Amino acid sequence: MVREEVAGSTQTLQWKCVESRVDSKRLYYGRFILSPLRKGQADTVGIALRRALLGEIEGTCITRAKFGSVPHEYSTIAGIEESVQEILLNLKEIVLRSNLYGVRDASICVKGPRYITAQDIILPPSVEIVDRAQPIANLTEPIDFCIDLQIKRDRGYQTELRKNYQDGSYPIDAVSMPVRNVNYSIFSCGNGNEKHEILFLEIWTNGSLTPKEALYEASRNLIDLFLPFLHAEEEGTSFEENKNRFTPPLFTFQKRLTNLKKNKKGIPLNCIFIDQLELTSRTYNCLKRANIHTLLDLLSKTEEDLLRIDSFRMEDRKHIWDTLEKHLPIDLLKNKLSF
């Protein structure tokens, strides 16, 4: 049982996980409540969380398979019970768990006769199979069977354009949706002016993350969406044309790293973690997903590298620039690292 208290402006909200169970390796269930909410608030929170849970949570999927010289996806391969299309559909159903960024390679290489399951996939270290018994194909004859795979972390439903795949490489329409279903219901209680609402939220996931983890990530994504409005007043945001247009200076991370090394040899930039740089949660999470953990990792990236990060925006770039302007002077580094 989990209980958290969040102080609101006029009320104290409480949330609980009232039920949690594992129905199978690929089906987790969690039931949560949030209360007390004023009339109408439960519906607002329920709609927002449901949309965020179903559309904003990232998942890892197999997005491409290369069989070799196979003319089309409806072909059959001698010694294999399933057609190429059936194998692609089975690969589409494989549930993976990871925190990888970008595209990774995987493969299957076995010799028949035997059943091929998810446990036969050779994966990079950052990827884990949720259900190793998921079927892929049945080899009925003593043949060598090898497939090259691509794995990607994304969100939502990704449809690949069908082209002429003469090299035997076929795209897989990936469903990067770890949350399988979300329901919410509202219960009203109290009398008169004391009347309030209780929100019940049910979450089913595919096993790549728990319902509690999904709820945390969805809530974090919603907070990130509203952060610009929270900072609008303090930044003096105006809708007047061109008033606050940001023209970024040349992003010279590598040049700054060179200058730092010239001024002070042996500065352990790998010991300065990005959580010390007072970044916003959104910027911090983008960098962490790209495996940028230290100041050295950050300084070694070019502007193009950063802009290729999923969900990384120009606002994040500006924020990083301003933060580095604040923290990169040598005397400040000396004070922080106690040289």
Swiss-Prot record:
| Protein transport as UniProt keyword | no
| Any one Gene Ontology molecular-function term assigned to this protein's record | protein dimerization activity
Family, similarity comment: Belongs to the RNA polymerase alpha chain family.
Q: What is known of its domains?
A: The N-terminal domain is essential for RNAP assembly and basal transcription, whereas the C-terminal domain is involved in interaction with transcriptional regulators and with upstream promoter elements.
| Protein name from the UniProt record | DNA-directed RNA polymerase subunit alpha
Q: Which GO terms describe its cellular component?
A: chloroplast; DNA-directed RNA polymerase complex; mitochondrion
Spell out the reaction equation it catalyses: RNA(n) + a ribonucleoside 5'-triphosphate = RNA(n+1) + diphosphate
Complexes and interactors? In plastids the minimal PEP RNA polymerase catalytic core is composed of four subunits: alpha, beta, beta', and beta''. When a (nuclear-encoded) sigma factor is associated with the core the holoenzyme is formed, which can initiate transcription.
List the InterPro entries hit by this protein, alphabetically.
DNA-dir_RNA_pol_insert, DNA-dir_RNA_pol_RpoA/D/Rpb3, DNA-dir_RpoA, RBP11-like, RNAP_asu_C, RNApol_insert_sf
> Top EC class per UniProt?
transferase
What biological process terms from GO does the record include? Answer: DNA-templated transcription
Pfam families listed in its UniProt record: RNA_pol_A_bac, RNA_pol_A_CTD, RNA_pol_L
From the UniProt entry, list the residue stretches annotated as the region Alpha N-terminal domain (alpha-NTD): 1-233
The EC code for this enzyme is 2.7.7.6
Give the taxonomic lineage as stored in the record: Eukaryota, Viridiplantae, Streptophyta, Embryophyta, Tracheophyta
